C-alpha cells in the first residue's frame, strides 16, 4: 500500500533542508502494508472514481486521508444534523455541523502541524518528468513498477471520451496534452494500440484526426525536439543570449515574471545546445505513429507557427511572429557558426547555466515549480550526467509526487503553507479553541518554522531576485520563493495567535520576524496600489505581446492581483492595531492606496475577477474582505453595494453558488450547468456577504446557503468533492483538494459567529435550567 510520510528527509546524501524538512510530504509504496480490509477500501475508492470520472473529475484525495484517520483511530462521535424544508437553522444545529467539520479536519493534520493535500490538475506536468527520466536512463530507478502502474492509472482515468486529454482534468482535449500522454504511455510500455479501454489507439486517432504533432503548441514542440520526435528547426528560437542582454533593455530577464523567466532559462539552454536524447527504437516508432506524413517528408520550416485550434487561447500577434522569423532567419544562423558560436553562444550558455545552478541551490533543488524542475534537472544532466547537480535534483523528485485514488500525479509544488494558513483561520473562527488547542498549537508551530529566514544567497539582485527574508512560500521553507498573499496569510495567523494564551497555542513570534514580513509586503505594492505576487511589478505592458505560449495569458511580466492586495490589506490593518508604532505612515498609505486599487478595478457587474480561484465568486470574496477591513460598508461604499448585488443575483435556487471554470478563460461570469451549486463557491459567497454586513440587512440568503452546506455534510464530517476550484494564468485549472474542507467549515464558523440564530430546543432547556437555578439562588 501507499503511505504518506511527513517531514522525512530520507537517507539520500544529496538532499538537504533549511528547517529539518518541516512541511515535506513524500509517498512510499510498502508491499507488506495494510490489512485485506484496508486494501479493499483503496480498491473501492479507485473503482468509484473510475465509474464517476466523467461526473467528478478531481480526486477526493482519499488515500492519505484513509491512512491518517486510521492511524489516529478517528471516529465521528457528534451525530449528523439535517435542516428540513421550512425549518429554521438553530445555533445548536449550526454548532453541531461546525463541530463535526472541525473535529474531522483536525484529525487530518500532519505531525508537523500542516495539512497535506493534493495540488495538481494540469495534465502537462507529469509526462515531461517521465520523458526526462527516460532520456537520462533513470526511469526504472525513479519510477519502479508500482509507480509506473499508478502513473498509467492517472493517464487512463483522465482520458476524455473523445480519446484526448485536456490542458487540465476538466478541460476539452488538446494536442499538447494528448500527444504528451500518448508518448508517456508508450514510454511506460504500452503498445500502439494498448492501454486500458484502448487508450493508445483512441489517443493516436485523436492526434492524427487533428493534424498530427506538427500542430503541437510551442512547449510541445520543445519537448518533442528534446525527445527526438521533432526537429529543432521546426521550433521558434529560444536564444540563450537573452541572458546576456544589457539590463537597460525592456525585455531584460529581470523585467520578466519569475515563472516565465524560470521556464525559458533551461529551455534556452537546451535549445542553445540543440540537445536531443538518445534515438531509441521507441523514438523511431513514435516518429511513424504521430505524423500524418512520413517523418522525413515534414517541411520543418513551415510547421513552426502551426498550432491546433483546440490549444489556442492566446493567438500570437503578428509582431511576435515577425520577431521569431527574424531571429530564425537572420540571428540563429549567425550565432551557430564560427566565430559567434564561440564568442557569443558559448558565453550565453555559461551564463544561463550559472543562473540555473543559482536557482537550484536557493530552492534546495525543488526549483520554483514543476515545469521548471524537470527542465532544470535535464539541463544539469546535459551539462554533466554524473554530476552532483543532477543527483541533487533526483533527490527532490519525491517532493512533487502525489498519490490518490486516481493514480500518481505531479504536484505544482505543494500548497502546504497556503492551505494551512487558511485552515488555521477557519479553525480559529469556529471559537472552539477549548476543543482543538493541540491542533492550533501544532499549526502555529508549523507556520513559525516555515517562515523564510534569509534572502537569496550572495548578490541576489544581480541574479534578478527580490528580497525573501520574512516571507512565506506557497509550500515550505525549503522552496524559498516569497509570495505576497502567502506572506500576508502567514503573518495574519501569527498575529491572531499572538493575542491568544501561549499555554494553549504556543509562544508568539518575535516582533522582528513580524517586521520582516511587513517589509516584504510593503516592497511589493505598485504605484497603482495593487500588490504583485512574487516580485515588484512595473515592466511595460506591451511586453505581453511576446507571450510565446499559446495556452496561457499574462505570463510575460508580473502583474497586480486582487487577492494579494486584499490579503495584505486585512493583515496590515490587524498589524497596525497590534504594532501601531511600526512604519505607521507607510502602512497607512499602503492601506489607502490598496483600497483605491480594489475599487478602481471592480468589474461593471459588481464582481472582481479572481486570478487564483474560480473566479468572480473567489475574487469578490477577497475584495469584500479587504474593503471591510478598512471600514468600507454597504452604507458608505458603492463598490460594496454593487458587489452584494452581484452575489445575490448569482445565488442558485437551492441556496448555493456555482460558477463554471469557464469564467476564468472567458473573463465573464459563467454559472455551472444545470443550476448546480458548489460548496466551496457557496462558502466564498457566504463569507463575502458576511463581510458586507448581509446578516444585519437580510440574513435569508445566508440561511439558505448555510442550509445547503449543513445538509451536504457527509456522515464523518467531511464534505463531498465537487468541481475544480483553482486556476492560474487565466486558462489552466488547479485542484486544491483541501478546499472542500476548509471553506465550508470556515463559512459555517462565520455564519454561526455573525448571524443571529435561535438557540434550539436543547440549548433553550439548558438556559432555562441555569436561569431557574440562578433565580432560586439569589431570590
UniProtKB/Swiss-Prot annotation:
Catalytic activity: (S)-2,3-epoxysqualene = beta-amyrin
The entry's keywords: Isomerase, Repeat
One cellular component term from this protein's GO annotations in UniProt: lipid droplet
Record field: transmembrane: none
Keyword Repeat applies: yes
UniProt function note: Oxidosqualene cyclase converting oxidosqualene into beta-amyrin, generating five rings and eight asymmetric centers in a single transformation.
EC category: isomerase
GO biological process annotation, one example: pentacyclic triterpenoid biosynthetic process
Family: Belongs to the terpene cyclase/mutase family.
Residue windows of the PFTB repeats: 148-189, 514-556, 640-681
SUPFAM superfamilies according to UniProt: Terpenoid cyclases/Protein prenyltransferases
InterPro entries xrefs: SQ_cyclase_C (IPR032696), SQ_cyclase_N (IPR032697), Squalene_cyclase (IPR018333), Terpene_synthase_CS (IPR002365), Terpenoid_cyclase/PrenylTrfase (IPR008930)
UniProt-listed PROSITE patterns: TERPENE_SYNTHASES
Entry's EC annotation: 5.4.99.39
GO molecular function: beta-amyrin synthase activity
Domain of life where this protein originates: Eukaryota
Name this protein carries in UniProt: Beta-amyrin synthase
Active site (catalytic residues): 485 (proton donor)
A UniProt-annotated Pfam family: SQHop_cyclase_C
